[in-house]
Each structure stands twice: as C-alpha cells, then as structure tokens.
UniProtKB/Swiss-Prot annotation:
Homodimer. One of its GO terms (molecular function) is D-lyxose ketol-isomerase activity. It catalyses: D-lyxose = D-xylulose. Its EC number is 5.3.1.15. Its cofactor is Mn(2+). The lineage of its organism: Bacteria, Bacillati, Bacillota, Bacilli, Bacillales. Keywords: Carbohydrate metabolism, Isomerase, Manganese, Metal-binding. It comes from the Bacteria. This is Probable D-lyxose ketol-isomerase. SUPFAM superfamilies: RmlC-like cupins. Sugar isomerase that catalyzes the reversible isomerization of D-lyxose to D-xylulose.
Length: 167
C-alpha cells in the first residue's frame, strides 16, 4: 500500500506538530528510486531552505530506513551540517566513528553491503545530535516510527552522495 500525505501528517500530529492544509500538500514522499518506500524511504516537510539555513520535519515509519549518505562540499561551502532532534518515537542514527558492537537495528538485509558506518546514536524525544558536514550517516526508526526535526545549514539534496550506487 502506498504512503499518503495524510498518513505522514498523522505522525506529525502524534508529535504535537501542526501543519496547515497547504503544508500537508507540500509533504515530500521519498523512496530513493528503490521502490520499497515502507522499508527504505523518508517523508518530510520543509519549513524553510535559504542560502543561510534550513528547517525540516522528518517522518520515518516503523523500521523505515533512510539510506547511508553524506552531504559533501558544494560551491565552496563545506557541506551541510545538520542537527536532528527527536520529537516522537525513537530513531537510531549511525555515523562515522567507533563501531557499536551490537547495533540495535540493521538496514534491510538485501541492501546491507551499502551501509558502512556503525557508530550508534539512539535518540528518544528531546534527544538531539549534530552531524558534521561531509559525514556518512544513515538512520532508522524504532517500532513506533519517529518524527525528527532537522535544523541545518542550506540543504542541497541533489548533491548528496549515497553509498548505494542505485540511488
């Protein structure tokens, strides 16, 4: 079954985030071209994205994974720095650094070769973490799904580099 913007908005409501009808229409549904959006994908709403800063609300459904990627330098800028703040549910963020011996979640088995960073950061509501520019990372929601506020420098998603060559 396909994902609807109304379903995404129900997660925002669980987190106490109110979007207008026009904003709900602007929710973006991403499957990264892999065709398995409930397993690998991301839903988001962009409040603002200027040449100085960006603010988004991300939704991940239960067990849904945003694939490994990094935000490289672009046009003389060092790459996007982003802070994630968990608003609802639980999100497991994996970044460069010392490998977590027993990660709490794993990416989809069929895609595992495209995941190379394993330093685990567990975010619950109120928890936040800042990802430095040009740092490989991926994340997955826990059993309830997750809502995450992203605050960052300018977002130029078309320049993101994914570890998976299919994306």
């Amino acid at each position: 079954m396909g994902i609807t913007k109304e379903e995404v908005n129900s997660y925002y409501q669980k987190a106490g985030i109110v979007l207008t009808d026009e904003e709900v229409d602007q929710i973006q549904l991403m499957d990264y071209g892999l065709g398995k959006e409930r397993k690998v994908g991301l839903q988001l709403f962009v409040y603002v994205n200027t040449d100085r800063y960006c603010s988004k609300e991300l939704v991940l459904f239960p067990g849904q994974t945003c694939p490994e990627h990094r935000h490289p330098p672009v046009d003389g800028q060092e790459g996007k720095q982003e802070t994630f703040r968990c608003r609802y549910g639980k999100v497991y963020l994996y970044v460069e650094g010392e490998k977590t011996p027993l990660p709490k979640v794993l990416p989809p088995q069929e895609d595992r070769e495209h995941y190379t960073v394993w330093h685990e950061i567990e975010l619950e509501p109120g928890g936040q973490y800042t990802i430095p520019p040009n740092t490989k990372h991926w994340f997955q929601a826990g059993e309830e799904g997750a809502v995450v506020t992203e605050m960052s420098s300018t977002s130029t998603d078309k320049h993101d580099i994914f570890t998976d060559p299919r994306i």
